[in-house]
């Protein structure tokens, strides 16, 4: 992230870049950010993340008027800490399709398209969902092991695990906010994952994602 920021620079209006992308396994591949690059965020930064996520959801995923939600401990407008309450007011006044606060369970429903949180919460959520996903896969594997051949169980496990791995399926997560296109891949990425990352970068280039983000930040 530091290298990309120094070499490419930041877009005007962006305070700090953020890593984000779709949460695989959610009903509609909800885009959420930040997932770990900014552990503490000002309300204005969260608003910027909302604008960025909306651009990605609309132009890369093809969502129509993406719904944006603030990840919180409850859906009521008076819930949350000062950071979230202040951010809620900014989102309400913005041009985004803001649906209010959401809870983590909403990430696996068709309620929201873009989920916003700081990097502290986002990284914990990312790793928890990855862990619980593998735990469920292992549980299913042990349950069917008595009925299916071991090689078939292993094949089933691998296919499900690969589809749940955002780094493999999507090639990585975009680094939003820098003046260029950067995809952050996993350190253990295989050739297919790297190829998917290149394809994602090409899609971002083709739709002029960087310019769209510039416009979104100016008008949010």
Residue ranges and their predicted role:
Residues 1, 74-78, 189-190:
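Gly/Ser/Thr-rich loops at beta-strand to alpha-helix junctions
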Residues 1-4, 36-41, 67-69, 83-85, ...:
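A generic short-segment signal for beta-strand/edge and adjacent turn/coil regions
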Residues 4-33, 111-115, 119-220:
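Glycine-rich phosphate/nucleotide-binding loop
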Residues 37-47, 184-191:
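Short, glycine-rich nucleotide/cofactor-binding loops
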Residues 39-104, 113:
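Glycine-rich phosphate/diphosphate-binding loop of Rossmann-like nucleotide-binding domains
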Residues 107-108:
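Structural alpha-helical scaffold elements that stabilize or flank donor/cofactor-binding regions
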């Amino acid at each position: 992230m530091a290298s990309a920021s120094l070499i490419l620079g930041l877009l005007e209006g962006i305070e700090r870049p953020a890593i984000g992308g779709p949460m695989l396994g959610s009903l509609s591949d909800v885009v959420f950010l930040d997932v770990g690059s900014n552990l503490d965020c000002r309300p204005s930064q969260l608003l910027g993340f909302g604008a960025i996520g909306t651009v990605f959801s609309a132009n890369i995923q093809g969502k129509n008027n993406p719904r944006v939600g603030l990840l919180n401990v409850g859906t009521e407008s008076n819930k949350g800490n000062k950071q979230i309450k202040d951010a809620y007011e900014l989102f309400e006044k913005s041009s985004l399709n803001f649906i209010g606060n959401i809870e983590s369970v909403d990430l696996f429903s068709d309620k929201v398209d873009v989920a916003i949180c700081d990097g502290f919460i986002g990284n914990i959520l990312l790793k928890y969902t990855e862990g619980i996903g593998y735990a469920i896969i292992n549980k299913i594997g042990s349950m069917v092991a008595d009925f299916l051949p071991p090689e078939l169980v292993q094949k089933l496990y691998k296919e499900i695990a690969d589809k749940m791995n955002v780094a493999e399926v999507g090639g990585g997560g975009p680094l939003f906010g820098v003046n260029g296109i950067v995809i952050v891949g996993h350190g253990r990425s295989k050739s297919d994952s790297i190829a998917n990352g290149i394809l994602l970068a090409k899609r971002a280039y083709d739709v002029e994602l960087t310019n769209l983000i510039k416009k979104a930040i100016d008008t949010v």
